[in-house]
Amino acid sequence: MIKGIAITTVWVLDQDRAKDFYTEKLGLEVRTDMTMGGEQGMRWLTVGAESQPDVELTLMVPGPPGLDPESAEAMKKLVSKGVLGAGVLSTDDIHRDYETLKAKGVDFLQEPRERPYGTEAILRDDSGNWFSLTQRNEQLDLDKAWGECVDPM
């Protein structure tokens, strides 16, 4: 039986730049950084939050062995265009983290806004992927207006 989510892929344009962004700006830690299949093989690079040792993001450049050249090129265009939302990053103090990340040069598409589920800001990584940075409420408040939603494009 499935026990949880362990690894998910975030498509990036440059693994070294992505590694710097996710570790130096977002504060995640490198879990794995190795080449599989010899010197010309595929680089397997994962990062994760110290508080979640069982959950990792694989920072992958679109290409073989998983994608043929045409699909890889299409994926790179989608990533750089900012079409792909990569997920939700959780925080216990969104205003503190928003200011800290902004000071580190993280690109925010939306400043913190109240939502029925909590407060969220939308950020973009150095490849174009966007994430919701969210501080969740104890309970869902369906009476609260959603407010204006940002278009990541």
Provide a role label for each language-model segment.
Residues 13-16, 64-130:
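Vicinal oxygen chelate
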Residues 1-19, 32, 84-89, 137-153:
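N-terminal beta-strand motif that seeds the catalytic metal site of vicinal oxygen chelate
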Residues 53, 63-67, 139:
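Active-site/binding-pocket entry motifs
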